[in-house]
């Protein structure tokens, strides 16, 4: 990123860093963020059933005018220096980005402690648990506005409530231990889905507005609307 100050990626609480450290951190932050948006775009293209096409935003940038089309409106981009983004194929990695991804994958796969931690989580963890007659669960139970369980499509089948937690937990484990390569890949992609999809119990908001918070000044674009579950959390009839 050369002389790019990467001001959209300024670190909070970075007073303890030298000017050169802050500059390097901001450039690294921007570089890996663009890689993230590209990688996510590739997953979305592989899985249109995830319903996340609206989160693919790189191809909605007008690179000549410096604006982003979002929700039928145009917004001025705060940063338009994207030397690694090809407007004709914005989600393709450059050779350097592909090399970074390969090295990161090798580092994760060969990190003994990380592998131990993941094995521990799979052995001891779960998305929900019944303990002392109490139901403990991560995040939220996706609900409709009327308080009923929301049906969610996972790889062509509908799930809701407990069944949704069960199938997501199942795919997380497949991502690590499935013998069939296709099922293992589906499990890995599902872990990303669980992290940021509006129908995921572990996220529970209509979008993860990372891109908008980086590149758009308008606060309206930063808003992340929570699932109705959070409005009904104290409603005894719903519970």
Task: Indicate residue ranges for each PLM-predicted region.
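Feature recognizes metal-dependent phosphohydrolase scaffolds
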Residues: 1-239
């Amino acid at each position: 990123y050369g002389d790019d100050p990467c001001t959209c990626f300024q670190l909070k609480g970075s007073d303890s860093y030298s000017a050169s450290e802050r500059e390097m951190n901001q450039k690294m932050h921007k570089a890996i963020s663009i890689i993230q948006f590209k990688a996510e775009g590739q997953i979305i293209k592989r899985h249109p059933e995830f319903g996340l096409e609206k989160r693919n935003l790189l191809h909605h940038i007008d690179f000549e005018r410096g604006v982003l089309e979002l929700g039928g409106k145009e917004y001025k981009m705060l940063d338009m220096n994207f030397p690694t983004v090809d407007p004709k194929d914005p989600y393709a990695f450059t050779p350097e980005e592909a090399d970074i991804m390969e090295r990161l994958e090798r580092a994760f796969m060969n990190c003994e402690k990380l592998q131990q931690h993941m094995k521990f989580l799979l052995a001891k963890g779960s998305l929900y648990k019944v303990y002392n007659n109490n139901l403990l669960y991560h995040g939220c139970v996706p609900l409709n506005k009327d308080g009923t369980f929301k049906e969610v499509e996972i790889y062509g089948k509908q799930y809701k409530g407990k069944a949704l937690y069960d199938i997501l937990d199942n795919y997380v484990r497949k991502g690590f231990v499935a013998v069939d390569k296709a099922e293992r890949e589906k499990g890995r992609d599902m872990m990303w889905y669980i992290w940021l999809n509006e129908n995921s119990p572990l996220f529970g908001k209509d979008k993860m507005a990372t891109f908008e918070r980086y590149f758009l000044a308008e606060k309206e674009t930063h808003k992340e609307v929570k699932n109705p579950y959070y409005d009904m959390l104290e409603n005894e009839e719903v519970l």
